Amino acid sequence: MRAEKHHKGWNEIKTNDSWAIFKIMGEFVNGFEKMSKIGPCVSVFGSARTKEDDPYYKLAVNVSKKIAEAGYGVITGGGPGIMEAGNRGANLAGGTSVGLNIDLPFEQHDNPYIDSDKSLDFDYFFVRKVMFVKYSQGFVVMPGGFGTLDELFEAITLIQTHKIGKFPIILVGSDFWTGLMDWIKGTMLKAGNISPEDLNLIKIVDTEDEVVEIIDAFYKGHTLSPNF
């Protein structure tokens, strides 16, 4: 793909970029139109590669079921693995189940547990990320890879820089996440690259009950609304 782009002239690239603006606008308009109607939701993130017999898949189902039973919808990336588990849990509880799918050359396909009227497809990661951040009342982050970390640190950065209001960010699975948090404390914090209070943005838990307790406790003192 990149080799092909090298052979294009700058004028051709400029023209293509100009037309891409309309596609980007269309994704934003369609996303805002649909997402504005879903009500309070919590986003569940994690690896697309997690298998159904994995303990974290089962935990993600239970976490999402509990979230839906507490009155929140569940938003995922719409694909397999932990994303499927998230939609599955919401579906089992009869709750709102939203999927924000991304067009990829591998891995990604819509899972069958998304509400038929709440499945959105995106070509652009950055448009999709806006939908997660704008319409989520909390981020629940299960074990995952680079994409999961991307979503996690995007939210932390936006809250830290006061571009959006604070909302719960919950890492599920202490065995998986403790090493990362130890590195953040022992390296980033020690070097003065973050402040001690920045660490308060993140909670690590191991059960579905803890997830819902944190979210409910937070919204006893905050209003449920889109983040910007």
Residue ranges and their predicted role:
Residues 2-6, 21, 218:
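Structural/interface elements that position substrates and couple domains in central-metabolism enzymes
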Residues 7-100:
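Glycine-rich beta-alpha loop segments
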Residues 35-37, 68, 91, 111-114, ...:
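Solvent-exposed alpha-helices and their adjacent loops that cap or buttress functional pockets
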Residues 81-141:
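Acidic/glycine-enriched connector segments
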Residues 104-108, 148, 176-179:
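Short gly/pro/ser/thr-enriched loop/turn and capping motifs at secondary-structure boundaries
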Residues 123-175, 219-225:
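Active-site/ligand-binding-proximal alpha/beta "capping" segment
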Residues 171-228:
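C-terminal functional extensions of proteins
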